[in-house]
Regions:
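Solvent-exposed alpha-helices and their adjacent loops that cap or buttress functional pockets
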Residues: 75-77, 101-102, 115, 134-136, ...
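Acidic-glycine-rich active-site phosphate/pyrophosphate-binding loop
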Residues: 89-104, 171, 185-195, 350-351
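Acidic/histidine-rich catalytic neighborhood of metal-dependent amide-processing enzymes
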Residues: 116-187, 383, 387-394
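Short coil/turn connectors at secondary-structure junctions
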Residues: 77-82, 97, 104-105, 137-141, ...
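Acidic/His- and Gly-rich active-site-bordering loop/insert found
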Residues: 2-111, 132-136, 335
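Metal-dependent amide/peptide-bond hydrolase catalytic core
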Residues: 1-7, 31, 61, 175-176, ...
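Alpha-helical metal-binding/catalytic segments enriched in His/Glu/Asp
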Residues: 84, 104-151, 190-196, 203-227, ...
Length: 395
């Protein structure tokens, strides 16, 4: 074992209880995206956890969502940076029955314990270990902590684009897969609201010629679900539907929320063509339909540069004797936005656990230390190769 590896693992072993305490402190603050006060408290707690480090810290006040935080080292990097990304919000509202902290052997349970407060702790203690060994000062790191990732990062997306434009590479600290999966690519997402308009009337009197918005929309929904399986990797889900006023009135209005996922831009285009054709045909039959794009997240393609970054991480994982697996994830994250700028990015460097977005969410205790060591080693190795011009296939 070389000195760097030996000293790093010893440093993080000494910090194991501090990592646990930091994670518990963050998890006990309920910070659902719409709970601004809770997210603000997490932001302040993270700000304080970073205080011992040689970082310039700036809280970015927000009106609608929780405050955000940006922290940077002073290292120049020739104008290029290493971008880290992590979000402070969870899906659990302030009054969620899933609250508190529980320990059971090798596992910690609690809201956001892997999605993604565990990732925040992994990153913070990786930087602490590098600072302790005098290595952080050579890394031009910028870390953006955002507050509304769980609803698609509507406020922070421009910030990520701006920071990614200055970055040579990026690491997103969402949780790792249960078998050590790390993402080199992610599906893109298209969120739509499809609306139908009918003609209101008394249900007892309107029999022939009834124009029901709900009935029209239901027929369209069946066709939309049939798009599944028609293009590689494309999934379509109509997750919400509502309409009408009372049971004895023909519904004049109805709407449905549609979630579309695709591993390629071509897949999204295919779905849009299917939807456009369906709407034109149904409108010719007399239906009144309209569609609104609610959200859109670009595909994070598994590029050669992303794979080059993963190769560095895999090499450091072998030194640590922990498993990692290259993976293409179905869900979207802030990594998609970073990739849209063209910056090489890896996601899933946070701790290992399961059942995020549920009351069974847990993290494997030992993975906090392991993934912190992996991140620290990968930052050093990737930056040194980048400076030498040997990191990416195109130099």
């Amino acid at each position: 074992m070389d000195d760097l590896l030996k000293n790093l693992t010893a440093c993080l072993q000494d910090q194991a209880e501090a990592m646990r305490d930091a994670l518990k402190h963050l998890v006990l603050i309920q910070s659902g995206t719409c709970n601004k006060a809770g997210v603000d408290r997490v932001c302040r707690a993270v700000y304080e956890l970073l205080e011992p480090l040689p970082l310039e810290r700036r809280i970015l006040p927000q009106e609608k969502y929780g405050d955000m935080l940006i922290a940077s080292t002073a290292a120049g990097g020739g104008g290029r940076r290493i971008l880290l990304a992590g979000h402070m919000d969870t899906i659990f509202p302030a009054d969620s029955p899933f609250n508190g902290w529980r320990e059971d052997g090798h596992f910690f349970y609690g809201p956001g314990v892997i999605d993604m407060k565990g990732g925040l702790v992994v990153g913070i203690f990786a930087l602490k270990a590098l600072a302790t060994m005098g290595l952080l000062r050579e890394l031009p790191v910028t870390w953006l902590f955002n507050s509304e990732e769980e609803i698609g990062s509507p406020a922070s997306r421009p910030l990520f684009r701006a920071e990614a434009g200055h970055a040579a590479m990026a690491f997103v600290l969402e949780c790792g897969g249960i078998n050590g999966e790390i993402a080199t690519g992610r599906k893109g997402r298209l969120g739509l609201k499809l609306s139908a308009r009918g003609r209101a009337g008394h249900a007892a009197k309107v029999v022939e010629g009834k124009k029901s918005a709900i009935l029209d929309l239901a027929r369209v929904i069946v066709e939309l679900e049939e798009v599944n399986g028609r293009f590689p990797g494309v999934s379509v889900n109509v997750g919400q539907m509502a309409g009408g006023v009372v049971p004895n009135s023909v519904p004049e209005k109805a709407w449905a929320a549609i979630d579309v996922r695709s591993p390629s831009a071509e897949g999204i285009s295919f779905f849009r063509e299917c939807l456009d054709g369906l709407m034109k045909r149904r409108e010719a039959e007399g239906m009144e339909l309209s569609v609104e794009v609610v959200s859109q997240t670009p595909v994070m393609e598994a590029t050669a540069n992303n794979k080059a970054l993963f190769a560095v991480i895999a090499g450091e994982a072998r030194r640590l004797e922990i498993p990692v697996v290259e993976h293409f994830r179905a869900g979207a994250s802030d990594a998609n936005t970073i990739a849209e700028v063209g910056t090489p990015v890896i996601d899933g460097l946070g701790p290992i656990g399961e059942h995020d977005h549920s009351d069974r969410e847990y993290v494997v205790r030992e993975s906090l230390r392991q993934r912190s060591a992996l991140l620290a080693l990968s930052l050093i190795a990737a930056w040194r190769r980048y400076e030498a011009g040997t990191l990416f296939p195109d130099g």
